[in-house]
Amino acid sequence: MADRDKNDIRKRLEELRKDNNRRNNRQDNGNRSPFSGFLFFIFVILLFTFTLLFHRDIQTYFQEKREISYTEFVSKTQKGDFSEINEKDDKLISQVKENGKDVLYYTKKITDRVGDEPNIISAIGQKKVKLNSLQPSGGGFFLLLLGQFLPMIIMIGLMVYLAKKMVGGSQGGGPGNIFGFGKSRVNKIDKKPDVKFDDVAGVDGAKEELREVVDFLKNPEKYTKAGARVPKGVLLLGRPGTGKTLLAKAVAGESGASFFSISGSEFVEMFVGVGASRVRDLFEKAKESSPSIIFIDEIDAIGRRRSVGKNSGSNDEREQTLNQLLVEMDGFETDTKVIVLAATNREDVLDPALLRAGRFDRRVTVDAPDLQGRIAILKVHSRNKKLARDVKLEDIAKITPGFVGADLANLLNEAAILAARRASDTIKMADLDEAVDKIGMGLGQKGKIIKPEEKKLLAYHEAGHAIMTELTPGADPVHKVTIIPRGDAGGFMMPLPEEKLVTTSRQMLAEIKVLFGGRAAEEIGLEDVSTGAYSDIKRATKVARAYVESVGMSKKLGPINFENSDDEYSFTPNKSDETVREIDLEIRKILTEEYFNTLNTLQDNWEKLEQVVELLLKKETITGDEVRRIIAGEKAEDILKGTEVKEESIQKGSEGIVQTSENSIEESQENKTVEAEVHDSNLKSDTEKLAEAVREITGETGGVLEPTEKNDFDKDSDDNEKNDDDNENSDDSSKNDSDSDDENENSDNKSEKNKKRKSNFKLPSFME
């Protein structure tokens, strides 16, 4: 055992030494600029030339200079201030020491030659001043010679440099190698990522599959003894954001193998043959560092199905890359510890040869998480965040069906941003609710001014959706209803979807009814319709088409699938023109029938719809519980009063006060109920019986409107008068009877209004 450990340690040290040398060479090639040596050589030549030609100018550049007039210059010469005068270009220059500093006096000549200026010549002769004539600026003949030969020198140096790089390019690639296109740009992860399998939640099935891959790399003997062969490739499938790349990072973090990461788009370049060369280079590096894992993200970039036909030549380069990948994966030996891990969300476009057994033996589907998976993901992403006590991640998971891991991480991040906007580091439940609405529907526009007519229309529209959601069997319950504009929507009704593996026919028809609820409510309540139902009608038509064309639930056409083929190269229609016409007629029939059923349901429950509209206009946002309370018979005014009492109690800041207030409200309601029961048992008035009957007719108890006859009301009125004669000696009974009469009159009026609305309503022309 000890010898075996020593051999493993020695082998591991040898691998580390090779990796270190390879890394150092790559760093040297990356840090060294391709033109660094040549540019340094040119820089030295230019610096020497500049110093040689302009050393006098450099010396005089830092001296103090004073330009004086020609007359003053002659005067100073006559006075003997100048001991030496230099003639250069068109200037006369003289250097004088003043107060310990060298001062340079100069003036322009008035003639081309200083010998033609008698004043200067006379002054120089009197004071015996030395006169010098300097070379013109610019270097003269040497600079002219250098200007002719310097370009040739530069060209020769560049050719020598490129020749050396060509020799080096045939031996290896890198940033400085002009022939390094064939080298793969793989990123070898030497430092293990911090991501572990415990950091990946909601995809337990996929984790178990990948744990076996990691275990094989750690304990290969356990599998080889049983005659098992390691999967040569593992393909991660799933919609975007489900955690495929995160699972690959977890594999890299858990396994002790070398991990190579590359994207599918990095194989193909502008030169022919580069992709295949990079595939070969990638697998060579992986074999040198085995046991190893190659992770190819977005493999559909190179693994797309090979085309056939005359126009297939445009994809030759990509197909060569794919062919080389197929050869490399099929060329593994059984004892080679190299596993290919790939991820894609487009399995349908992959080439069948890539998916066959022996290449990608195992396919791991990473689905969207269920309820428990979403709860686990939320817990993982909330580890580094402070959550308030009122936060319930289970409730957030319930209202986010279909959210994947990336969506849930973004949700918590948006909630944290909203908390920071409040200058707080604690996330509240309100922040999470706002984040859900923001991600699902867009940014809220609470400050937007809406006209009263539009606000009323929005209230009817959303109330229609809510009522139909609660009263339609098979529909999901309501979670929230709002008329606050958000994104492109003026308002929305958020359902609380249940986890479903399959969808029944009744559920699909229920979805159509719910979608039509908004338009039907507008048509009945406002006797007009708006463009707000555009998306609802579009979605309802899509559901109806799937009902007939895809899942074969139409009774007329039967269980037949009429969808077009997914093959992009198939142009043969799969149904006749007559069948297309029958499909369109069946879709229209379904939509018309469900719209008619929606109109009937809203007419029969119009009082409940009006109560929801009233509550929406006053609160703008209501919960699903409040909608269900209205359907159960509670009034909008009672709900508003209860909300106001609760808000006042919360503002006092005492939990005890809140509890006492709620208890007192409950006790008062219980007392009223007891008193009503005693009153009912003692008096048994026919008037109260009439009130109960009217409440049942108007739908306050959740029942459906039943047709009523005028004689029933006359009979109840006679019984009411008789009851008044029997109880005329009791003041309390008279008062209660009076209240009952008022209530009956109001209920009677509402019932008459409802019947009048039903009698006056006209069906749309397309339904007549």
Curated annotation (Swiss-Prot):
GO terms for biological process: protein catabolic process; proteolysis. Keywords: ATP-binding, Cell inner membrane, Cell membrane, Hydrolase, Membrane, Metal-binding, Metalloprotease, Nucleotide-binding, Protease, Transmembrane, Transmembrane helix, Zinc. Its EC number is 3.4.24.-. InterPro entries: AAA+_ATPase (IPR003593), AAA_lid_3 (IPR041569), ATP-dep_Zn_Metalloprotease (IPR050928), ATPase_AAA_core (IPR003959), ATPase_AAA_CS (IPR003960), FtsH (IPR005936), P-loop_NTPase (IPR027417), Pept_M41_FtsH_extracell (IPR011546). Residues 715-731 have a biased composition (Acidic residues). GO terms for molecular function: ATP binding; ATP hydrolysis activity; ATP-dependent peptidase activity; metalloendopeptidase activity; zinc ion binding. It is found in: Cell inner membrane. ATP binds at residues 238-245. It is an enzyme of class 3 (hydrolase). The chain crosses the membrane at residues 34-54, 140-160. PANTHER family: AFG3 LIKE MATRIX AAA PEPTIDASE SUBUNIT 2, ISOFORM A (PTHR43655:SF2), ATP-DEPENDENT PROTEASE (PTHR43655). In the central section; belongs to the AAA ATPase family. In the C-terminal section; belongs to the peptidase M41 family. Acts as a processive, ATP-dependent zinc metallopeptidase for both cytoplasmic and membrane proteins. Plays a role in the quality control of integral membrane proteins. This is ATP-dependent zinc metalloprotease FtsH. It comes from Leptotrichia buccalis (strain ATCC 14201 / DSM 1135 / JCM 12969 / NCTC 10249 / C-1013-b).
